[in-house]
């Protein structure tokens, strides 16, 4: 696959009128191909692999929230990055997930070409699948380079998307607690 990507990046560079053999660009097709493989490595990962059995029995039945998980993804429309933060909460149902696994789930889905709305849903559904939680809430806030570097060129826009499942969707007080906790900004 790497050789095919290298050839395609060479063709793109030449199509833009550049000399792919000039000093500054000579290794660019290979570097760009490797970068794209890294940025899309989520296609080669599975939920079972990234969670690695880190689900533990627990009597905890109150909300668990992990805030400000940084994420980097590629918009499927322009192949430009969007960069942001993900907040995940769940109401355990006899099981809790190892803390680092939330970041791994976010990365697995973020390292694919897609739109933010789908990314938000994929993360929520994965957490629900792994934990069998009573409820799951996910909010992503991100800046999209496709809107900042091209098109309307708006530098300060932030897109927010949310998915609420189970009690996070059906119980207004649970949903409100999640939103309040996400929006509280207390320095540690």
UniProtKB/Swiss-Prot annotation:
Q: Please give one Pfam family short name.
A: GTP_cyclohydroI
* E.C. code: 3.5.4.16
Q: Which GO terms describe its biological process?
A: one-carbon metabolic process; tetrahydrobiopterin biosynthetic process; tetrahydrofolate biosynthetic process
What is the superkingdom listed in this entry's lineage?
Bacteria
UniProt cross-references to InterPro entries, sorted A to Z: GTP-CH-I_C/QueF, GTP-CH-I_N, GTP_CycHdrlase_I, GTP_CycHdrlase_I_CS, GTP_CycHdrlase_I_dom
What chemistry does it catalyse, as a reaction equation? GTP + H2O = 7,8-dihydroneopterin 3'-triphosphate + formate + H(+)
The protein's matches in PROSITE patterns, at most eight in alphabetical order, are given as:
GTP_CYCLOHYDROL_1_1 (PS00859), GTP_CYCLOHYDROL_1_2 (PS00860)
Task: Cite the record's note on assembly.
Answer: Toroid-shaped homodecamer, composed of two pentamers of five dimers.
Give the protein's recorded name.
Answer: GTP cyclohydrolase 1
Query: Where does this protein come from, organism-wise?
Result: Hahella chejuensis (strain KCTC 2396)
């Amino acid at each position: 696959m790497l050789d095919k990507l290298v050839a395609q990046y060479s063709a793109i560079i030449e199509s833009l009128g550049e000399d792919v053999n000039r000093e500054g660009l000579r290794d660019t097709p290979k570097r760009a191909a490797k970068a794209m493989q890294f940025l899309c490595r989520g296609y080669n990962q599975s939920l079972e692999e990234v969670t690695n059995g880190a689900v533990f029995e627990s009597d905890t039945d109150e909300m668990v929230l992990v805030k400000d998980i940084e994420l980097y993804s590629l918009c499927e429309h322009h192949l430009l990055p969007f960069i942001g933060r993900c907040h995940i909460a769940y109401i355990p149902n006899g099981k809790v997930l190892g803390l680092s696994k939330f970041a791994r789930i976010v990365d697995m889905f973020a390292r694919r070409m897609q739109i933010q709305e789908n990314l938000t849903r994929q993360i929520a559904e994965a957490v629900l699948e792994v934990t069998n939680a009573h409820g799951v809430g996910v909010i992503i806030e991100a800046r999209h380079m496709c809107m900042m570097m091209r098109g309307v060129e708006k530098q300060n826009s932030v897109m927010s998307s949310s998915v609420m499942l189970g009690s996070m969707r059906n119980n207004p007080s649970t949903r409100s607690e999640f939103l309040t906790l996400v929006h509280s900004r207390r320095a540690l």
